[in-house]
Amino acid sequence: MQQERDHKRDCCKLMPQTVKAFFKCLRFRRSSSSSSDMVKARARNEEKEEPSSIETSTRSLNVMRKGIRKQPVSSGKRGGVNDYDM
């Protein structure tokens, strides 16, 4: 246990002061974000979701088209069975 604590302290010492200050700034920004900022962020996220839903629907249509497409009739070269009557 003592060795793990010492190791954690060493890791923290390796991190420069500027990086620590940067993380503190990020934490402060997150905690200080007002409710109006949250509403704006939600509105932006909703706007971004609409095109993605359209993209997924077009993708699903493309997948369905591939499934509807008939498989080519085997020529019999590899031992396949022909669908048509001779």
UniProtKB/Swiss-Prot annotation:
Region (Disordered), start-end ranges: 31-86
UniProt function note: Elicitor of plant defense.
Record family assignment: Belongs to the brassicaceae elicitor peptide family.
Recorded coiled-coil stretches: none
Keyword annotations: Plant defense
Single GO BP term: innate immune response
Propeptide, residue positions: 1-59
Protein name as annotated: Elicitor peptide 5
